[in-house]
From Swiss-Prot:
Binding partners and assembly: Monomer.
Binding annotation for ATP: 14-21
Source taxonomy: Bacteria, Bacillati, Bacillota, Bacilli, Bacillales
InterPro entries in alphabetical order: Dimethylallyltransferase, IPT, P-loop_NTPase
Binding site for substrate: 16-21
Interaction with substrate tRNA (site feature) positions: 105
Protein name listed in UniProt: tRNA dimethylallyltransferase
Catalysed reactions, as listed in the record: adenosine(37) in tRNA + dimethylallyl diphosphate = N(6)-dimethylallyladenosine(37) in tRNA + diphosphate
Organism: Staphylococcus haemolyticus (strain JCSC1435)
Family: Belongs to the IPP transferase family.
Record keywords: ATP-binding, Magnesium, Nucleotide-binding, Transferase, tRNA processing
Length: 332
């Protein structure tokens, strides 16, 4: 299928605290767009501050999707994201608007843009239930023990995935339990046919500036009540759920339990956030063809002008109606 026959899609990526939310909202105002979150954690209710979830005030009337759709103990896979996002893109496009994906979860973005062969991830409820029971047995194990288990049947994935990346390790195990196939083998035969006419935009800046923004964002989150958010989740019994392994939550659980000081936890949280941002940038630059905009050399308005110029050229073949801009209230 030629690009002219594919739905038009704008994707905004970048590391945490780079300004994706602000750019996506301002862009949506100018191009008659609606925003789909491409963040794996913003789907969860009650996890607002630690995921830097956009507020109703910041949305400023722009529709946002894939936010607050699950409870903290619900499971959510790349395949789930792809199905929901595809339906949303179809709906948004059918109404003459432009869908904008904004987020930092690289695998989610890649699975949506390209034709991932996910057919064999559709499993029966019986198999899925058995898989979940087996995964529950792994919960008490350490990261290294879970990683060692993965290595018994998929040594290549064990080699590719760090033991501390528990989420990816568990995803590889879950894939095997559901399909009896190795996720490492699937990647080798993966197709990369583009599903959409995609304008892929990335935000970058110097490491020094990015790390400063990350540290400031953590301080802002704490000032807005991140500790109480984590405490409330722990008190509701969500401590052992997969969602609570996210950065911003796992670091503060020991504080809630009286096992660590808040100062130590904050330093760890900032360090983990900086490390995650570095991994995000590496992933995007290795896996996707991104048009990068430097936030230090370009103002927000300069980025918007350049992006809208490109969109106007490409969207002339699509039924899209640009609008006039309004201002944003977004912090970091």
């Amino acid at each position: 299928m030629s690009d002219i026959n594919k739905p038009f899609l704008v994707v905004i990526v970048g590391p945490t605290a780079s300004g994706k939310t602000e750019l996506s909202i301002e862009l949506a105002k100018q191009i008659n767009g609606e925003i789909i979150s491409g963040d794996s954690m913003q789907v969860y209710k009650q996890m607002d501050i630690g995921t830097a979830k956009v507020t109703n005030e910041e949305m400023d009337g722009i529709p946002h999707y894939m936010i607050d759709i699950l409870n903290p103990d619900d499971s959510f896979s790349v395949y789930d994201f792809k199905l929901r996002a595809q339906a949303l893109i179809e709906d948004i496009t059918s109404r003459g608007k432009i869908p904008i994906i904004a987020g930092g979860t690289g695998l989610y973005i890649q699975s949506l843009i390209y034709d991932y062969p996910f057919d064999d991830e559709t499993v029966s409820k019986e198999v899925e239930q058995k898989t979940q029971l087996q995964l529950q047995k792994l919960e008490p194990l350490t990261n290294q023990e879970v990683h060692d288990y993965l290595a018994t049947f998929d040594p290549q994935s064990a080699k590719d995935i760090h033991p501390n990346n528990r989420k990816r390790v568990l995803r590889a195990i879950e894939y095997y339990l559901n399909t009896k196939k190795l996720i490492s083998s699937r990647k080798k035969v993966q197709q990369f046919t583009e599903n959409y006419d995609t304008l892929l935009i990335g935000i970058e800046m110097s490491r020094k500036t990015l790390y400063s923004r990350i540290n400031k964002r953590v301080d802002i989150m704490l000032g807005h009540g991140l500790f109480n958010e984590v405490k409330n989740l722990v008190e509701q019994g969500y401590e052992s759920t997969q969602s609570m392994q996210a950065i911003g939550y796992k670091e503060l659980v020991p504080v809630v339990n009286g096992e660590l000081s808040i100062d130590q936890a904050v330093e760890t949280l900032k360090q983990h956030s900086r490390q995650y941002a570095k991994r995000q940038l590496t992933w995007f630059k290795n896996k996707l063809t991104v048009q990068w905009f430097n936030r230090e050399t370009m103002s927000l308005q300069m980025m918007l002008d350049e992006i809208t110029t490109q969109i106007n050229k490409r969207s002339s073949k699509h039924d899209c109606k640009p609008q006039h801009p309004r201002s944003s209230t977004r912090e970091l």
